[in-house]
Amino acid sequence: PDASSLSLQSDIKLRDYQESAVDSWLKAGGEGVIVAPCGAGKTVMGLAATTKIDTKVLVLVHTRDLAAQWGERCQQIVGVDATLYGGGKKDDTGRIVVATFQTLERMRWAERYQWAKQFGMCIVDEAHHVPAATFCSVMVTIPARYRLGLTATPDRPDGLTDLLHWHLGPTVASIDTKMLALEGQVVAPRIEWLNTGWKPKKEGQEWVKLITEMTTDDDRNATIVNRALAAVDEGRQVLILSDRVDHCLFLANALAEYSLQAVAFVGSVSKKKRAEILARANDREIDVICATTVADEGLDLPGLDTVMLTTPSKALNRVQQRIGRAMRPHPEKKEPIVIDLVDEPRSLRGIARKRLRLYTRLGCR
């Protein structure tokens, strides 16, 4: 490939592992996936790759929050104003165009293919979503010669990981969390197991009913609230994660009654309000954020030091994404902790043991 008219801003210096990952992608012919944990600088590596090839670039994301983040980072890292194609805007005039999968999926197949022919390179952020039907239908119509996938968690529990590589190429670089922790690029959190003592009224319930009963249990919720209060008393900022919107709303209200600055960060919160919450949280004006899966990706809070996992997850890649929120280094940050709730049923303790193996692999204490 020719040298690109894009270049890194003078204050951006790639770390050795970032440079090595981009070089590996180039040597693989400009196709492949870079696997890197939260805090490793996936966006920096993606944009560094764009400086190696002189072509128009399409960045594909699956949320408006991520689209906005890429827009900001393009200006900071390569000094280019990216244009946005999605979320109500349809501007494809930029040297770099950031588009949402959902917007492209609404185009007719032939129309999308003709539109995408203007791009010589395609970057997919959170690339582990590519095997999903909606994203696959978009990817087959993107003819870009150069392709780069970025993800912390390429392995899918549904066994469709091969589809990711079919669309984007092999894994060309895999950056190890333990190595990053040794270099001080991420901070491995301490794991605190919090026994709730909770057990369901009857054994053998289906998963959805089990989670409903768990998240509406008064004693269990009191345990969560009390531990969050103690963390805030220690000067910590807490992210409480739950799979249920109602649970997040309940916990935010319960904590607000103790005069804490507690907010719910859920799907129904507007884009403008989310940006406002993140800005206030980064200024330490918010004590506790209670969030659903919308926080799994695209939640940018470098100063966050405490994550509470309040609903059990069988998807280890999702757990890894979630604890990654606390692993970014920050000068004013306390030792990060992940508070993992453990309940009484044997099945849930079995899932907790799988999480323990993940934590060990990631170098958590």
Give the location of each predicted region.
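Walker A/P-loop
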Residues: 28-53, 290
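Conserved helicase ATPase core of P-loop NTP-dependent helicases/translocases
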Residues: 68, 81-93, 109, 239, ...
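Conserved nucleic-acid-binding Ia/Ib motif block in the N-terminal RecA-like helicase ATPase lobe
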Residues: 51, 55-106, 262-264
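Conserved pre-motif I regulatory segment
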Residues: 1-35
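Conserved interdomain hinge at the start of the Helicase C-terminal
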Residues: 202-243, 249-254
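Conserved RecA-like P-loop NTPase helicase motor core
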Residues: 261, 267-362
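Conserved helix/coil segment N-terminal to the catalytic DExD/H
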Residues: 87-121, 132-137
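Post-DEXD/H (motif II) to motif III coupling segment of the RecA-like Helicase ATP-binding lobe
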Residues: 120-121, 128-192, 359
